[in-house]
A protein has these predicted regions:
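Beta-hairpin "wing" of winged helix-turn-helix
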Residues: 82-92, 99
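Conserved segment of winged-helix/HTH DNA-binding domains
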Residues: 99-122
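N-terminal helix-turn-helix DNA-binding core of bacterial DNA-binding proteins
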Residues: 24-72, 96-103
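Short intrinsically disordered, low-complexity coil segments enriched in acidic
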Residues: 1-3, 47-48, 118
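N-terminal leader segment of winged-helix/HTH proteins
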Residues: 1-41
Length: 122
């Protein structure tokens, strides 16, 4: 919100802390994949879809109606979410139902939503 970032007034390296963190740092490819995950989550339409699926398993037609977009546009977004393993689907007759892929996605979304809601309360 425009506040300045505080900086150290003198340079002093805390080698013990640096080594502890360095030893526990994930591999570079894992960090790249994590950044990609957050990129996928960085789209408002995909966040709406995740919110919808956070609440209820749903078919493409219903998601499109809720979001106010075409089924083909929603299908494209669902494809992106599926490639990132954020959503999964199941078929029931001619209808395809989407849901969040696993509990991790639910937790990520729930924590993010709570974080934003707390910011609005300040």
């Amino acid at each position: 919100n425009g506040e300045n970032i505080a900086e150290c007034e003198f340079k002093h390296i805390h080698q013990d802390i640096i080594e502890t963190v360095r030893e526990n740092m994930p591999e570079e490819d894992i960090l790249v994949d994590l950044a990609e995950l957050f990129k996928v989550l960085g789209d408002q339409t995909r966040i709406k879809i995740i919110f919808i699926l956070f609440k209820e398993e749903m078919c493409v037609c219903d998601i499109a109606e809720l979001v106010g977009m075409t089924q083909s546009a929603i299908s494209h977004q669902l494809r992106v979410l599926k490639q990132a393993r954020l959503v999964k689907f199941r078929k029931e007759g001619k209808t395809v139902f989407y849901s969040l892929d696993d509990d991790h996605i639910t937790k990520i979304f729930d924590y993010g939503l709570h974080h934003i809601e707390e910011m609005y309360k300040r």
